[in-house]
Design a protein with these regions (language model features):
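C-terminal ends of transmembrane alpha-helices
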Residues: 33-36, 116-126, 179-190
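Alpha-helical transmembrane segments of multipass membrane proteins
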Residues: 26, 30-31, 111-115, 180, ...
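Alpha-helical transmembrane segments of multi-pass membrane proteins, especially transporters
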Residues: 51, 55, 103-108, 176, ...
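Alpha-helical membrane-inserting segments
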Residues: 34, 65, 114, 118, ...
Length: 247
């Protein structure tokens, strides 16, 4: 039995190694980061450097940086992000495939809903070290702007990866997400840990959806179901004959 289980594991690693790497790097690690940050915020109120980073950015404020931060934070507001996500989802449904439309819509829309839920649970108060140029209300953890921008960038990156123009998403997208996150800290409405949690949570959420919508995930699930059926024939039913793997 041990030899058979070990052989099944080796076969899974060989056949599905890219998907398993995506599960580890794109899904597990971001959630580990998010859970760690959330735990520190919950138990200790945040990281020791949160306040120092805010004060350093405010000490180096400048009119040009003020305008840049306001522009970036406006671009990451829920309304324009929601409109953009809705238009992109509709476009994918018309000109691409329904799974891609579902993937993109759930990536951005789901990230926004998750953000509201986490804010209500953690209930972290916003920093109030100076009067902000654009005050924000409700709770602070995690940054919805950072999470929405990261979800948009990550989803576009996955969708465009098979195409030649993928670098048009993989370079500006992360820069946009970084810029939006910086603007929230610069304006004094979020702690750096809020932004870090928003980024990590989005990458983990979108990566999870990418895996679930991947044909390789269904192949991997079928592979392990067949293996379990061979070991536990009376407990696990085999895949149906001719069962179609979703695209």
């Amino acid at each position: 039995m041990r030899a058979s289980c070990w052989q099944n594991l080796r076969n899974a690693l060989r056949i599905h190694k890219m998907l398993l790497l995506a599960l580890l790097a794109g899904l597990v690690l971001p959630w580990v980061v998010f859970v760690h940050v959330a735990e520190v915020v919950w138990e200790a109120g945040g990281f020791a450097g949160d306040r120092q980073i805010l004060e350093w950015l405010h000490a180096h404020a400048a009119p040009a940086l003020d305008q840049l931060a306001l522009a970036l934070t406006a671009a990451g507001d829920p309304l324009p992000m929601g409109i953009l996500a809705a238009l992109a989802t509709a476009g994918l449904a018309v000109w691409s495939t329904r799974p891609q439309a579902w993937f993109f819509g759930l990536s951005v829309g789901g990230a926004m809903l998750l953000n509201v839920a986490v804010k209500a649970v953690v209930a972290r108060l916003r920093p109030a070290l100076w009067p902000s140029l654009k005050p924000a209300f409700y709770y602070s953890f995690r940054s919805g702007h950072a999470m929405g921008a990261a979800a948009l960038a990550t989803a576009l990156g996955f969708l465009l990866w098979p195409h030649r123009g993928r670098w048009l998403a993989w370079v500006p997208g992360p820069l946009f997400a970084l810029g939006v996150g910086w603007s929230r800290v610069y304006l004094g409405v979020h702690y750096p840990s809020d932004v870090l949690a928003g980024w990590a949570g989005s990458v983990g959420w979108v990566a999870a959806l990418h895996v679930l919508f991947s044909p390789g995930f269904h192949e991997l699930r079928r592979f392990w179901r067949e293996a379990l059926h061979r070991r536990l024939p009376g407990v696990v039913s085999p895949p149906r004959e001719g069962q179609r793997v979703p695209a």
